[in-house]
Amino acid sequence: MAKNICITRIENLLKKSSIKTIKKEEIMNTIKTVMAEKKLSSINEVDVDAVAKDVTSQMKLQKQKDKINAIKDEIIVRKYQERILTNFDGNEFEGLASIMVGSNDQITGARDSVSVAQTSAIANLFTEANQAFKKEGVFLLFKDMDEKTQRIVNRTVEELAAEPTLTEQRLGQKPRVTEKNPEIIKVAKVMHEFSENLRQTLNAKGANIPKMWGWVVKHSNDMFEVRSAANRLGLKLDDIKVDPNLKGTDINYNKNFTAWKNFAMQGLDGDRTFANADDIDSFMLNVYNTLVGNKIQMAEGASSIYGSRNYAKGAGAKRILHYKTADDWFNYHLKFGTGTLQEAFYSGIMTAGRNIGMIDKLGSRPIDNFEKIRLGVQKVLIEKGRNTQAISSFQPFKKWMNVIDGSIYTVDNFALARFGAIGRGIGNVSKLGGAAVSATSDLAIYGSEMKHQGDVFLGSMADAMAALARIRQTPEFKDIAEGLGFMMDGIITDTASRNQVGDNMSKGMTDIQRTFFKLNLLTWWTNTLKENAMLGMANYYAKQKNLKLNELNKPLQNLFNVYNIDSVKWDVIRKQAMTKASDGREFINISQLDNISDLDMQKILGRSDLSKSELQIQKTNFKYSVSGILIDRSIHAVIQPDARVKGVMTQGLLKGTGMGEAIGFLGQFKGFPMALVNMVGGREMGFIKKGPNQDIGRGIRGMGATFVTLVMMGYVAMSLKDLLKGKEPRDPRLKSTWFAAAAQGGGLGIYGDVLFREQRDSGSIVSGIVGPGATTIADVLLAINYGIRGEGGKAGKAAYRAVSQNIPFANLFYIKTAFDYIIGYQIMETMSPGVLKRVERRMKKDYNQEYLFTKPSITNKGF
């Protein structure tokens, strides 16, 4: 691009001035941005005063935001320092951890964390978006849009966001919308207005994102497609010529970058995209590295949100690609975007929600603010002569920061991360066929969580069973659950499993896993119980509406205390946030908290000097905090790893690093037992630990009741598995049966046949403990070893085991038994004659167990 003459003149004038270098950069970058946004090739084309006014206002706005953000950050730092020194006296490490990922300690505000705020913000944004589509009667149209409709909707979004021309302004007209279908216009309008409201919300919280059409979908990039750009575009790597001076990781990386860049450049608005870029190739390589590393998903603070302005050179804001038209962007999206337009929309919402939760709790500069809090607490302890070794470094907390800012979803080495994700994905769909059967222990955990809140243990378990027996809720109660913040896994799987949870997976692997977990019934099981848990809690809280906080039962008081719900907040909730269903039952209604009065909000905050807009922000924050209680407790009732457990399991390591991948394989299938120990066991330990709400008896009783019920449900799960395999239940009179039931109920049952196969060599037991990947490798090595030694039978058996245990979908509980009886037992007998009789003898000896029907050894003699 040729350098603009006007820009050159201004730069020369600034060089001769006494203005500081940093200031000169800000002025020039602002002028370039304003000219690009106004599509000006020369300032002479318009009144120079208009440009000057715009430049001045933008620089003033940024200064104001920087000042306000600094004040808010200081308030956050001081508030947390006081909270930790007061509430976590003697365990300051736990107090610092609680800021990010919550704590099980029974202390005021212990679970009022960044991670809960993020989860709640995402869930409520999803709910608000879905309800907006439903209100217009176009939710199904939006959900089921084909490619042609997506393109039209996307184009209409751009037209709705267009600024009126001078002629249109004089005539009082709005920009023209070419689409005539009113339903499509409604879909586009909801998307545009939601995106714009979300942008304004983030700006109100400290960001500085300029108005741009479709902001929320422009986060959309599929790291897998971007990294394999040549293949995605149907190009051969050998035919791509690259700049020899390009600083990529290797020649293939450079060729894929070149293919991606050449395609993207075709639709880019160069003047606007590269307004502040000194070198276009460097700019585009920076963008490419960010996309391949999945760094666009991170929540690093106000100035780093996608699209946020920062005029200082080298600033950390994410680079923006501006396209000439909506069709140009959509053409790019079809090749390199996150699936459909709908997925791009939800993906943008999730990233925005993570940013909102982060900023609300840790301000505009999260890591810097956390370090100020830590150092401030450390300083006070040193002055008191206390030991500060536990909090002397940021390193122990980094693993949790990497979870909440999204670093663990970024990639260091793409190839290693991709192959690791594929390996673990294959493991999931070939070894978790019986996961829903193993999940019967969820019922015990469900009951223990409700008991923790003051409800009835066995009654809550019965309620959960009734929910499963109903198969699905009525539309009315589904709407109530959605309003509380419930998100069905099936709705968000496409996006969440690819960018937000666990491994980053390609579209194909995501679809395979989504189908598999539907077929093994785990999606239905989890959604049903989580939905019922949220409805049950909302109904339980509503039943207490006539009681003041100090009149509630002690367990519920303790629960509200750890989420910072005091008497003033509870009075507002019980007065304002109630709704009655058609069957007469009452529920907490989160959406009603939008309508609380300014006076009530002032009482909650303890101040009356806030503006209308600031009060509205606080009302939304309060609504999200109440929803956060229900969402957070629902993952304790239907256990899944929270941010704290994820940090411990991953140690904050990136995918694509040697240790990150090793830990990924080591931790596969261990999420449930780890969460069980940390979240359920930790919950009860919170009462045993020293503190203002210590109740050792309650903690011991809670652990005991949970353990006994888990063992009982473990036996039920084992028995169901045996029945599905055509076996009798194990003899309950044997001690070994109850040890196995304890292991099953405690989470080891998720391994299915991985750990408890009848056929395995003793050397592979250790491999099973360290993960299914190691088990498969052990079987392959055993087969090779036996083959070298000439032991064909053993080699064949190990090889068959390695293959049969890694066939996707073959492990589905209703397929596995049929496969075994049709051909599996025949193969086993062929590979190792007499093996079926040995299995039957072992079953009788170890478990006092027989087959229900004809013994496999009678009808299967091998081929």
Language model regions located:
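Short linear interaction motifs
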Residues: 176-180, 287-291, 296, 302-330, ...
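Low-complexity, highly charged intrinsically disordered N-terminal segments
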Residues: 345-385
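Short amphipathic alpha-helical coiled-coil/interface segments
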Residues: 181-199, 393-405, 423-426, 484, ...
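Domain-level detector for long, ordered catalytic/regulatory cores in large eukaryotic signaling
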Residues: 214, 220, 262, 269-274, ...
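Glycine-centered flexible beta-alpha turn that most often forms the glycine-rich phosphate-binding loop
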Residues: 581-582, 589-673
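Small-residue-rich, membrane-active alpha-helical segments
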Residues: 436-505, 662-863
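Low-complexity, small/polar and acidic-rich linker and loop segments
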Residues: 2-197, 201-207, 211-231
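Acidic/polar, low-complexity linker and loop regions
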Residues: 147-176, 378-419
